[in-house]
Amino acid sequence: MPPYTAAQKQQITQFVSFTQANNTTAAKFLRQSRWNTEEAIDAFKNRIAPASMGLIFRPCATAGVREAVLRISIFQKLIPGLPAGNDALADWVLYLYGFTFLLKEFRDSPEENPDTIGIEGAMRYLGDIEVELDEVTCLAIAELLQSPSMGEFTREGFLNGWRSVQCDSIAKMAAHAANLRTRIPSEPDLFRRVYRYTFPLCLVQGQRNLQFEIAVEQWNLFFTTPKGGIAWNTTTTPWLDWWVEFLEERGKKPVNKDLWQQVEVFMRKTHEDEAFGWWSEDGAWPGTLDDFVAWVRKKRGDEGAMEE
């Protein structure tokens, strides 16, 4: 194998610094990702989580840090990516140790569901990090922690989510939540990611479409400003009010995933041009939005609307 270049050596150093893995593991993941450091680190995190979290957490939950290090060191040769050396391993264990006790504090049923924070625990936890249940930031936290359903957090999602943003205490988590609250209305990519994650989060178990009432509740959250969203209504057109009125006239039908996602795109297009200069009959919009455009034009008395 040819020697590493100066740039590759620097990447190995960066990988080791971020993950606390050894040089051999760093080089392996970097080669597999064609020396893309970010992809290599993501691959490392995704691989180590399912393979080793159980082995790491069990001793952390029942023993002190020193004893946990001794127990986990047995698995160092068996688990790819575990930090080498007792000092690095101790740092790793301390990090997970803190999360273990944080999770234990908020679990609803430690015996029945030891790896899950349920609704009651989630409410207490969100209160501690100063997040209200009826604000967009609450949904952003759910997206960050990959919550499987509303008001539920898993151990793996909790750990991986907060570790990805380097938050390991209630104070840091509260600060990150406050930062999200500021960024969501002004960062379209972040807003869209949270908005889209809300669809599966709010689905009733066993259903593929969102109940109309739930969809309207979430639109009122995302498309108004009081709880951290973006105002869709303007001084000239009450877009959100008309959208809900239009759907009510059509029978309050359930909302599918495509329509849910495209409504947010449509909202931003109406901000660019309320006169629909961007709209085309040949566009790839859902039929419901095509019909809404015609409905709005007729309601506003736009020229030519009656002939469409």
UniProtKB/Swiss-Prot annotation:
The UniProt GO MF terms for this protein read:
cullin family protein binding; ubiquitin conjugating enzyme binding; ubiquitin-like protein binding
- Positions of the UBA-like domain: 8-45
- Report keywords, A-Z: Ubl conjugation pathway
- A Gene Ontology term for the protein's cellular component: ubiquitin ligase complex
Taxonomically, the superkingdom here is Eukaryota
Gene Ontology biological-process annotations: protein neddylation
Question: What does it do?
Answer: May contribute to neddylation of cullin components of SCF-type E3 ubiquitin ligase complexes. Neddylation of cullins play an essential role in the regulation of SCF-type complexes activity.
In its UniProt entry, what is this protein called? Defective in cullin neddylation protein 1
Record gene name: dcn1
